Design a protein with these regions (language model features):
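Juxtamembrane intracellular "pre-TM" segments in multi-pass secondary transporters
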Residues: 2-10, 190-222
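Helix-loop junctions at membrane interfaces in 12-TM secondary transporters
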Residues: 10-11, 95-107
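C-terminal ends and interior cores of transmembrane alpha-helices
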Residues: 84-99
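C-terminal membrane-cytosol helix-exit motif in multi-pass small-molecule transporters
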Residues: 157-158, 177-198
């Protein structure tokens, strides 16, 4: 029975891996163009990298709401809503570039970062769809999608840069929006899942108790250092 569950869950894993490749492409596009466009749109040079910072802040801010949304409504609805919101954010970014509006562009980067918080849940959905002994393989396949995105995202951005005359790179974000819509179509093929049952009596340890654990502190510090280094390199 476990073997049957592992085999039956693999189509979902491939769907999630494909969606990961499509959605992560938008993030890599912000990494590629965020600093360049920030330098062009920012009112002062010191704010040039704010779009990249906004994306990272969006990721941090979206983590807890994403978890609550999936618990209340299920993974599939949360995935679909997030992909749609990311496509809208790409349209906002394109409009901001055409209007030479810095703050709306930063807002779009923030929303795309928040979408990343949902995209990071794809691997866990993949692990839950197969037998426990195949969870590692499922997670690895989804993570390969990010490697594909590292190539696809910048390539799409460069090739569609002049799509809209007079607004360099606005077309890049429209193309990214199309990728998010493609991800939406892929995610719509996932089977419907039931939200977690919340009875109001609570369960598990309080977040404060978890945060006091040495292991939690070490994990948070490692994440802070890793993202700080990544942001510095970007």
């Amino acid at each position: 029975e476990k073997r049957k569950r592992g085999v039956e869950g693999m189509p979902q894993v491939w769907l999630l891996a494909s969606a990961q490749a499509l959605c992560a492409s938008g993030s890599f596009l912000v990494v590629l163009l965020g600093g360049i466009l920030g330098a062009e749109l920012a009112p002062v040079p010191g704010l040039s990298t704010l779009p990249l910072a906004a994306m990272v802040l969006g990721l941090a801010a979206g983590t807890v709401p994403a978890a609550f949304a999936m618990r209340r409504y299920g993974r599939r609805p949360a995935f679909l809503a997030s992909a749609l919101l990311a496509a809208v954010a790409c349209c906002l970014a394109a409009a901001a570039i055409r209007a030479q509006a810095f703050w709306p562009f930063c807002a779009s980067a923030f929303v795309l970062g928040a979408n990343n918080a949902v995209v990071m849940q794809y691997r866990f959905a993949a692990a839950e769809s197969v037998a426990p002994e195949r969870a590692g393989q499922a997670i690895a396949l989804v993570m390969v999608g990010a490697l594909v995105a590292a190539v696809v995202g910048p390539e799409v951005g460069v090739r569609s840069a002049e799509l809209l005359a007079g607004s360099r790179f606005a077309g890049s974000f429209l193309a990214a929006g199309a990728l998010y819509l493609a991800a939406l179509a892929v995610l719509s093929r996932l089977p419907r899942d039931r939200p977690a049952i919340v009875d109001g009596r609570g369960g598990g340890r309080p977040l404060a108790a978890i945060a006091r654990q040495p292991e939690f502190v070490v994990a948070v510090l490692a994440g802070v250092v890793a993202y700080a280094v990544m942001s510095f390199i970007m």
